[in-house]
């Protein structure tokens, strides 16, 4: 653990993590649940720094069945996911608390939305800089390097930290 920056609170059997345990990763993601032979095995939950969680049944480190719950309480549904799509474009907070009056738009599930640093994108779990291809969390700590697919998705889909003129140029 000293080499990975992780922390383990629990028992060992034959030098391997085993039994009920708490495993904290360097990203501050925390696993609380059962371990066997050094792997997630049985019932366990991953708690993410942004407040979301993943409750799952694990077998030899792999998910058998699981449920992801966002920090606001919305549960991801793999079968009928219609959140913020062409079918229903409301954010979860709008579903729970109602729509704002005409003329006042809600840009994100968080209202008011986070201020995005210049040149960056808000990709849902942090800010993405397309020049460095690095995603940092909202406290500006390193999360990950984006691969080509994630870069393309973020640039195509996510909110920008700048305004763009759409349609015809306004007259001066």
UniProtKB/Swiss-Prot annotation:
MORN repeats lie at residues 8-30, 31-53, 54-75. It is found in: Cell projection, Cilium, Flagellum. Keywords: Cell projection, Cilium, Flagellum, Repeat. InterPro entries: MORN (IPR003409), Morn5 (IPR042814). SMART domains: MORN (SM00698). GO terms for cellular component: sperm flagellum. PANTHER family: MORN REPEAT-CONTAINING PROTEIN 5 (PTHR46437:SF1). This is MORN repeat-containing protein 5. It comes from Bos taurus (Bovine). The gene is MORN5.
